[in-house]
């Protein structure tokens, strides 16, 4: 009986070892097939390079951000081509330079519906460069990349300098969202 248990234990150990080795090789092969690069831009801002070579930028408060790394603090063009621009809510430390990036690159800004609408209405963002997300809605803005808006508990107020009066105005900008971003290889990032 003892010999049988010893043999069974050895067989299970070998099977587990082979399984783990195979799993490790599979994970390494998947990683080699494409990696996701993540660069912190300060505050809640990130630049993501997908396995397919696309660039996603989230919450780009660059020129006003105290922790923005050089050269992005003084030159938003340093981001390179932005394929997807996401904003979680209208506070300046999140929306930051997003409208300027959208206009400079003719890239659509994706954000909560009640944030994008006043951006367009106030003339901050051209209508063709704003995409309104509903919470729990998802889109596939780029081939192989899926973005899902998820609930986030935070306020959202758009402060805009009115060019006619030179004064700041506050505008309600709906509820904040987070994003689950699924890359071409299935890897997911949850940004809140």
PLM-predicted stretches and their roles:
Residues 48-51, 141-143, 181-185:
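Active-site beta-strand termini and strand-to-loop segments that position acidic
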